[in-house]
Amino acid sequence: MVRPAQVRALSGLARSATFVRLLPSQSQNALRCASLPVSRLGALPLRATTQITSAPLRQWHQIRNSSATATASLAEQAAADPEGLSQAEIISNIDAEEWKRISKVRNIGIAAHIDSGKTTATERVLFYTGRINAIHEVRGRDSVGAKMDSMDLEREKGITIQSAATFCDWVKKENGKEEKYHFNLIDTPGHIDFTIEVERALRVLDGAVMILCAVSGVQSQTITVDRQMKRYNVPRISFVNKMDRMGANPFKAIDQINNKLKLPAAAVQVPIGAEDEFQGVVDLIRMKAIYNEGPRGETIVEKDEIPEHIKPLAEERRRILIETLADVDDEIAEIFLDEREPTIEQIKAAIRRATIALKFTPVFMGSALADKSIQPMLDGVCDYLPNPSEVTNLALDQKRKEAQVKLLPYGSQPFVGLAFKLEESNFGQLTYIRVYQGTLRKGANVFNARNDKKVKVPRIVRMHSNEMEEVQEIGAGEICAVFGVDCASGDTFTDGQLAYTMSSMFVPEPVISLSIKPKNNKDSANFSKAMARFQREDPTFRVSYDTESEQTIISGMGELHLDIYVERMRREYKVDCETGQPQVAYRETIGRRVEFDHLLKKQSGGPGDYARVVGWMEPSESLEENKFEEQIVGGAISEKFLFACEKGFNLACEKGPLIGHKVLGTKMVINDGATHMTDSSEMSFKNATQQAFRKAFMESQPHVLEPLMKTVVTAPIEFQGDVIGLLNKRNATINDSEIGVDEFTVYADCSLNGMFGFSSHLRAATQGKGEYTMEFSHYEKAPGQLQKELVQKYLKAQADRHKK
């Protein structure tokens, strides 16, 4: 509530639209009637402005100058004290025309477990918003495939591999009013091997729709997506899909969101019928029945009469909704304690506040395949997910030791944008950019913060899957794609006025590798081109060259991940490849504390090598990291040489002496040493440290570590015994299991080495009805027999190379 004193204080300058944004909508409307917004006045033609008397003209200049001063002041505070600057203050200073645009923008992603219906739902969204004229299904039964699956591979396999970006407009109709919203929409993969695509999408989005299956509820990849959303503070609404499936139970899914994801959730709808008899939903906020009519459900019919048999359920679930909101929102809590009934507006406002604050997710329900209840979910995106100005975005100022700064969603501010995805198109490299601050214009020069390289932006396009639409400029909060900008995924661009960089995305380490080479030497040039392009596009796809085996090694997140790239090379570059057996990314670690006193001494007449290092090695506190410490007293080794020692330690950790894999969980301490006046050098100390490391490591009873994978297997219930048997054969540790109406799920930790070929065995054991996902969990000591085999194999390979 706005008090009279506040309204008086907000008179004068505060009546301009630039200061009105903090007030509730009723007060905004009252104040806006009192004066013409600054931006509109500034846009009047000359003959109109000349008719304004001198006093109002002076007042207008004062208002305009005051607005510019306020923006400059906020920009200073955003850099000096980002935590002290609230989003409310930022929003209050947005120009009226800019607010009109940005308040109706929603940057949203659709994410979920594989086969939950993400792409099917997106296809309906595009159809109902008028972006496409016909609906095509995912698995290409009509030989077309879903619009958002633009790669041939995606259409064949029925999965989404890359994040497809599109935009569409949705007209929200309520109480006889129509409001047009602009969606930038990203459809993401559900398969765990393509998790980097989900990471990249969530990094640049302001909100998300989390889709769950009404039968399976929260699944393994749902938990991964939840973790990613929490990492990037992405608010979400939830949509329980497949309500027409046998065994559909949306309330089980809601319980799992509450219990498994630890996120307060409540239904904002209840179904009218279920399974084959699913007809529509009841809106619990307005207590209206909603049905879809028309050949593809394009017509929404609302009825005040709720079916009698649904009323008790609707009333019970509405009570639960209000109780849940009372736990996460102070205003509803106060109303609840006073035993008053909240109004529709109060409930909707509370859901919006709690959702944006990451305290709550409203749950919608429907069936994308049956064309039911998608439109109310789109209204939910408008009502409950934030616009770009309501989300805090931070950058790092390189000129101030990477101090955090808050970005302002103002078109007048210096441009800052993030390249979050790269694609190769027929017209060259396509770079997807999210504009966080300022305006990106066609023909403008932008600077890459990573290498300070200046590039010109020749074309700006909005993408619709693999089609495009050219635009002249893109404002703050929008997503676009540009041509002719050479960069890497995760690069920050500015207009040169600021030395800002965005914090980078989390990129998981690869867990599987294999050797690869083209079958024909004439394809080597295309092979190299493909490798370079795939690395630029996907940070989880790594390429290296093993000098000892003289092989090119590719590494990634799983077998499917690498298979897709091998297949893409064949299709897109006409390069057939030979691949070796998949190799597990083992690690090595120290077994116990070992002391060392190592002297490197080489003198041959001229300048020689001399370095003595003394200290010890021991297991570090965390298995995940290596640690180097110096405890030199009295300057026995100079700072310059100690830096070389640390470099030698890091190099030694890259390739362990036991089986040639990276070293983890090892700490090295140097506490004494000696130097020679002429023969000591940085190279001497680097080499001495590496030699001391190798010797001490092999004396420490070292261990091989193998990656354990968090594995989730789902199959029809009649195959439970066969699946458990398959896992036991692979020495899996079964952590948990769930039994549903017609299927069961097993959660286990499995050795990656034992899981090669598991997919074909699972298909055979379950008649093709089982599915599984694997995600890296942690490293654990390998069995003694496996370690012995790996060491023997490594020693034999070393001996064979020496013979050559």
From Swiss-Prot:
Stretches that traverse the bilayer: none
Chain residues that bind GTP: 112-119, 187-191, 241-244
Alphabetized UniProt keyword annotations: Elongation factor, GTP-binding, Mitochondrion, Nucleotide-binding, Protein biosynthesis, Transit peptide
Superkingdom of the source species: Eukaryota
Cellular component GO terms held in the UniProt record: mitochondrion
Principal cellular location given in the protein's record: mitochondrion
Record-level Gene Ontology MF annotations: GTP binding; GTPase activity; translation elongation factor activity
InterPro entries in UniProt: EFG_II, EFG_III, EFG_III/V, EFG_IV, EFG_V-like, EFTu-like_2, G_TR_CS, P-loop_NTPase
Function field: Mitochondrial GTPase that catalyzes the GTP-dependent ribosomal translocation step during translation elongation. During this step, the ribosome changes from the pre-translocational (PRE) to the post-translocational (POST) state as the newly formed A-site-bound peptidyl-tRNA and P-site-bound deacylated tRNA move to the P and E sites, respectively. Catalyzes the coordinated movement of the two tRNA molecules, the mRNA and conformational changes in the ribosome.
GO biological processes: mitochondrial translational elongation
Lineage: Eukaryota, Fungi, Dikarya, Ascomycota, Pezizomycotina
Organelle targeting peptide span: 1-9
Protein name: Elongation factor G, mitochondrial
Annotated compartments: Mitochondrion
Disulfide bonds: none
Native organism: Talaromyces stipitatus (strain ATCC 10500 / CBS 375.48 / QM 6759 / NRRL 1006) (Penicillium stipitatum)
Functional pathway: Protein biosynthesis; polypeptide chain elongation
tr-type G domain mapped to chain residues: 103-389
Keyword tRNA processing: no
Family the entry assigns: Belongs to the TRAFAC class translation factor GTPase superfamily. Classic translation factor GTPase family. EF-G/EF-2 subfamily.
Pfam name, any one: GTP_EFTU_D2
